Amino acid sequence: MQILRNIAEVKDFLALNQGKEIGFVPTMGALHAGHESLIKKSVQDNEVSIVSVFVNPTQFLAGEDLENYPRNEARDIEVAKAAGADAIFLPDVSQMYPSDISIKAPSALASILEGATRPGHFDGVCTVLAKFFNIIRPMRAYFGKKDTQQLIIVQNLVKSLFFDIEIVPCDIIRAGDGLALSSRNSYLGESELIEACKLYRALVKAKALVSAGTFSSDVIKAEMAKVLDPLKIDYIEICDRELNSIDQIQTDKSIILIAAYVGKTRLIDNLWL
């Protein structure tokens, strides 16, 4: 596996692999089994797979955890290599942001859910991804469904800016207790890890209600809130596949999304129905 630290090295690597199908897995590091599954999917689908590790400052708001975000470059390199990546791109901020030009995320999608409490977050996401897409020019890019809103916004970005890239959604990877894998899980203490499983249990409750014939969004959200108690709930929303809020669940067309605080750590999870 090649370790690439600047754009010139990426261009040289791509020149050596000209004409091959390129898969791309963008990450902020602190790689775990969820990221590993994305990398393995890329390796399966493409002739060459590139992983990026970059803690993108423009998607963090003032007071968020940019400085404390978990970083372990040596382990990230090990995980990417073990998963079969052909190259890992580890740029610094000066490489990615030589100027302050940015991209605005679509306001209708970026101002709800995560965007309601993190204004500007998705502008940072879209800006850095547009840069990576231009540098690497992949055929396919891989995103986990855990960040569903990000996934849908990226699909919109690619369509709107005419990037010739297939966005490949990948299923959420969970621990044995159902907790969705996340780099921010490293912030949780032992008792908080147990409490964090309530997010998944609330989604399981929702799925059981739908299976039993309950489709009312209000009823389902109320029952989910009981499961989440006493966690501080940021939101429970039930939407269609374009993130429009809906009153009734339609099977194979709906998504249930949760954001809640476990101690000081904000976690998200979702279920596609």
Predicted regions span which residues?
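Nucleotidyltransferase catalytic core that binds NTPs
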Residues: 2-230, 239, 271
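Phosphate/ribose-recognition catalytic cores of enzymes acting on nucleotide-derived substrates
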Residues: 223-273
